[in-house]
Amino acid sequence: MLKDTRESCRLTCQVPPLSVDFAKRNLMLRTSVTPEGRFRVGIHTPSYQVSNLRENDHLGSLGTLPDQTVVDNRENFPDGDIRVEKARPIYEILNPLPFRGCTYIDSEWAAARAADPGLIKMDRPGPVSLRAILGTHCPAATIREIVTQLPLPLRYELAATSTDAEELVWLAESCCRMVCTDDGVPVGLQYNESNGRRQAMIDNFELFETIGNNPHLPDQYKKIMVLRPGVQGNSEIVGDFRQGATEIFEYLRSNSYIPWGHYAANFAPTSIRYGIADLSPLDIEGLRHLYYQRVFITVAEKLGIGPAIRRRPLTPAELETLRQEILGALAVDNQLESLATLWGWNFGYDFSGSGYRLHASHQMIHQQYAMVPQWVDDTCGGQNEAYSSGDLIADLIDRYRQDYHSDLFTDYLAALAHNTRTDGGGGEQSLVVWQDRNVLLFVPKAQVSQWELQLLVIADYAGGPVGNIIEADAAVRRSLDMGILKAQQILAGLGATMVSSIEYSKRLGVANGQRLLYAFLPKLPWSMGAFSEAQGRFILGHYPEDFAVACRRQLR
């Protein structure tokens, strides 16, 4: 178990420097993890001079102070060269996973949050009702007409942000044709048919989808617009989970952008879940059960040991038995191609008035998953290795062992256990947010999203570290489910409304010490990504240790 340590920064400074010979291009691996079990942290406090090459001055007034003193711009036009003396510290932290770039922390921005980690949050928006505002200025008979005839960008914004159920209904009814009962209750959509293809009569799909993803839309409208099976297409339902108040459908996306198809676990119309606060542990269990079940069944069938079960889900006991049979079959004769799992969750939806879709989810809470083959046919007739994000970690493990003669995850866990503050101060040291005997939820030393969390399996199985869900027994899977739920609850508690979650898994049949890892990546309004992030340079305004404090407070 990891412990919160307060060891001297002297230990951190004993880490050998990064060795570089640019003439020979001999560069040590770009990771902050070291064989000494410490994080390598760089600090920039440069002093430098800038030659002034400006030819002309453009002096002018910017305005006045309350006493009418003129505020001008003369500071922008110095006469001579500029000398910068010891600029404020900028911390540079290589990501433990080199393919994820490098993080830069501005010490001035981070200082305020170090003094008060409670500043790390987003305030929840207040109520929004254009109908209520118009009601104080316009006759009631004209309000609906105004709302539904606003310029399209304004309707997009209202559809995304309104908390007024009635005006959302107005917008919904204005952008599609509905089937209603005699007393006006909507029960379905109207369809056109052309060349044997039926299509809902929707005037503006982006507006329709944005309204349908607003939690404040009445549930009956949610059901007929986005939740009812078939309303989003003809994807077959090939699995389900129903227990208590939880009902989830597993859709097959056979003609998928993911080769070999993928699956989507979506909540049924009987179990509407639009916010993380709506999610129960049973909900997460159901979502993940469908994932485990599909992967286990797929692998078992490829091994020729698939169960004869049809038209019902596997029980937890049957699922665990099948997992053990898979491991047994792989141990006896591992001729199966080295498959990998693919899992992701885009939580949250937003659409800007300028027409930008800000997140990929088309229904607030659903998860997607697939299997990745080992090989892909080459257009020239050969074969290439198929891409899986977990392979990037496998490559790193091999390179780390080659360069350092040490194990990456052993050293990574030691670095997490022995972490000291990034700024060298005496405040909170720990990056750990929550853990049990099987998994560790923590703040990465180098975050690629300003509020990134990661979940790492620390349990082992008979063959070594657990690197994929086939190697995870029932207890480890329960810990994973709980860790995923806690991560989402923490981020939602801080105010995050859009979170992308991904899995880095080891391929089947590989024994390289790789551990199963999940990353939770919120999208924040002030940090959507720009050229810095495109170059792998991630800019933060807090220290990771202080973000860990803010996260732990959400668990109280």
Predicted features by range, described:
Residues 1-556:
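HIT superfamily nucleotide-processing domains
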